Regions:
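Acidic, polar-rich low-complexity tracts and alpha-helical solenoid repeat scaffolds
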Residues: 1-218
Length: 218
């Protein structure tokens, strides 16, 4: 008997619950449809944005690959320079193509030509490519014996401490520039800082050797 009563009680509770849900749905039917529609719309928009971003990354990757391939080919096929020039004229990969052209001429020791491309690279965003261009500017200035300019470039990089670029490379460029200018004490200090902060890197090891040689010359 008690089991039957409990069974009926559960049925009544279930019926009450279902009735409450039906009443709730009827009372807030419009609001529920609006919320559901908003959720569906948001899901569609999110999916669309993800698809667009994926497509953009794919296009960007292909464009970067094209620039990289051309940069590798121009050493053997100088005629490809014209194709790289076209990519440097504008578009997604203009900065990268311009940097590759600057590198090409720097490797040929045509510092003026390299500089003519480096000045075309925008001052931002301050990403890896930006600091690669700044480093190359420092190398070109050092090769042209414009030591003050080189020191200024490398000091700016080291002061900014960018996460996008290896600080040991910038410190090494700074120390080289100071050494070339004859600022021996400053160069030794920079080499020693590099050695202390980056002992396990190539530049840290090279800095220890150069600092030792400069100490002997003093």
């Amino acid at each position: 008997m008690k089991r039957t009563e409990r069974h009926h009680l559960k049925e009544d509770e279930m019926a009450t619950g279902v009735h409450w849900l039906v009443q709730f749905f009827r009372s807030y039917q419009r609001e529920i449809y609006i919320v559901a529609g908003a959720v569906v719309f948001a899901a569609v928009v999110f999916s669309g944005l993800m698809a667009i971003r994926s497509r953009a990354r794919s296009v960007q990757s292909a464009a970067v690959g094209q620039v990289t391939a051309l940069a590798a080919e121009i050493e053997q096929t100088p005629a490809k320079l014209a194709d790289l020039e076209k990519l440097a004229a504008g578009g997604r990969t203009a900065r990268l193509a311009t940097l590759e052209l600057a590198r090409y001429w720097a490797e040929k020791s045509d510092w003026a030509k390299a500089d003519s491309y480096l000045v075309k690279i925008p001052a931002g965003p301050k990403d890896l490519l930006y600091y690669q261009a700044e480093d190359l500017k420092g190398q070109v200035a050092l090769a042209r014996k414009d030591y003050d300019k080189a020191i200024g470039i490398y000091k700016k990089i080291t002061d900014e401490k960018p996460k996008a670029y290896p600080l040991d490379a910038a410190l090494f460029g700074l120390a080289q520039s100071q050494e070339a200018k004859g600022e021996t004490a400053a160069a030794i200090e920079t080499y020693q800082k590099l050695q202390a902060d980056f002992p396990q890197t190539y530049y840290g090891y090279e800095a220890s050797l150069r600092a030792g040689k400069l100490e002997i010359r003093k």
